Curated annotation (Swiss-Prot):
It holds the Pfam family ADH_N. The gene is YIM1. Its main location: other. The keyword Mitochondrion applies. The keyword Secreted does not apply. It comes from Saccharomyces cerevisiae (strain RM11-1a). This is Protein YIM1. It comes from the Eukaryota. It is found in: Lipid droplet; Mitochondrion.
């Protein structure tokens, strides 16, 4: 067999009745890409909850019976480039990014990823992560760990509200998630937001203090609403929040939202990336995401506050902001655990456990 003909292994599923598995296909590196595409030999890919959500919601009658590949975040090396590819992307370049798809035959939990760098954005050249001598992870692991979560956090802060100042105040529900980790670093180090309050378990408070939160409130010691209310009255001089950001799925504040969120006229926002309830990744249904209450919050013209569903928005250039923050040392992608490719099931189980503190990454090389 020619060295240009390789076996491409990918982690795939067909629908919500089939488990994830490794599938193999033959790939001819001489002809598998178009003139405007590159072939990336993937070194690492990160898992995200969207992988489980799309898998469990995949009805074969609606979404077809072809193999669908896991994951969106990636890092790797360009090994082939079409003749029409912009010359900023060359063979040998180390790159990372987010390959956006819902039910794509191409995903990033694969050994070879083919994409169009002009269309399949964001993609960027990897930057070196500042590390100490005891750091166990290489740059490929770090590079795969941040595009989707960082992009979600940055887009939430950048796209909805434009007038952040040192007087601004934000409440983060779910301070321990990877998205919230990025959120607080971006809020404090890029937008210079004055006050960021986080809600987390009492056991996570010490960890999260080091991330930059100004104040932390436990959700497992009394009422969340009452605990935040006391903080607002005693410490924040009863000033309300410019944004409430929910990264876990919560509805506790809705009945009393006017006590915590500034008026709609002041350009305040309630932004969620998880819906109104904490998801059980092992048993997900469409009702968890397309509930009547969510629809009403999104389209109801009579509600007194702005409600939005957050997601990464590549055109806002978040990938370059992330690179700059990584180089400056103001953001370091958090890693929970790293697994080899054939340990993909253990990696999935780890993320589904809801116990991961940082990204779960799978290495291909």
């Amino acid at each position: 067999m020619s060295d240009e003909i390789v076996t491409n292994k990918s982690v795939t599923y067909v629908n919500n009745t089939t488990p994830v598995t490794i599938t193999s296909s033959e790939l001819d590196l001489r002809s598998c890409y178009q003139d405007d595409e590159v072939v990336i030999e993937v070194h690492a890919a990160a898992l995200n909850p969207i992988d489980f959500i799309t898998h469990q919601l995949c009805n074969s009658y609606i979404f077809g019976k072809y193999p669908k590949t896991y994951s969106r975040d990636y890092s790797g090396v360009i090994i082939k480039a079409g003749k029409d590819v912009d010359n900023r992307w060359k063979v040998g370049d180390k790159v990372n990014g987010m390959y956006s798809h819902i039910y794509g035959e191409r995903g990033t939990l694969t050994h070879y990823l083919i994409l169009n760098p002009a269309k399949d954005i964001p993609i960027t050249h990897m930057v070196e992560v500042p590390k100490d001598e005891n750091d166990p992870y290489d740059d490929f692991v770090y590079a795969a760990a941040w595009p989707l979560t960082f992009g979600t956090a940055f887009s939430t802060l950048y796209d909805f509200k434009k007038d952040w100042t040192s007087d601004s105040k934000v409440l983060v529900i779910g301070a321990s998630t990877s998205v919230s980790y990025a959120f607080v670093h971006i809020a404090k180090n890029y937008f210079n937001i004055g006050t960021v309050v986080g809600i987390c378990s009492k056991n996570s408070i010490e960890r999260n203090k080091k991330l930059g939160y100004d104040y932390l409130v436990p959700y497992d010691e009394g009422s969340i609403v009452e605990n935040v209310k006391k903080l607002k009255q005693i410490v924040l001089e009863n000033d309300k929040f410019d944004m409430i950001f929910d990264s876990v799925g919560n509805h506790d504040f809705f009945p009393v939202i006017d006590q915590f969120l500034k008026p709609k006229a002041k350009n305040s926002f309630y932004v969620t990336i998880a819906g109104n309830n904490k998801a059980n990744y092992k048993n997900i249904s469409w009702r968890d995401f397309v509930s009547l209450s969510s629809i009403l919050k999104a389209i109801n013209p009579f509600k007194k506050y702005n409600w939005r569903f957050g997601h990464p928005y590549p055109p806002n250039n978040f990938i370059e902001v992330g690179n700059e923050m990584i180089k400056k040392g103001t953001y370091k992608p958090p890693i929970d655990s790293v697994y080899e490719f054939d340990q993909y099931k253990e990696a999935i189980d780890r993320l589904m456990s809801n116990r991961a503190k940082g990204k779960v990454v799978v290495k291909m090389k």
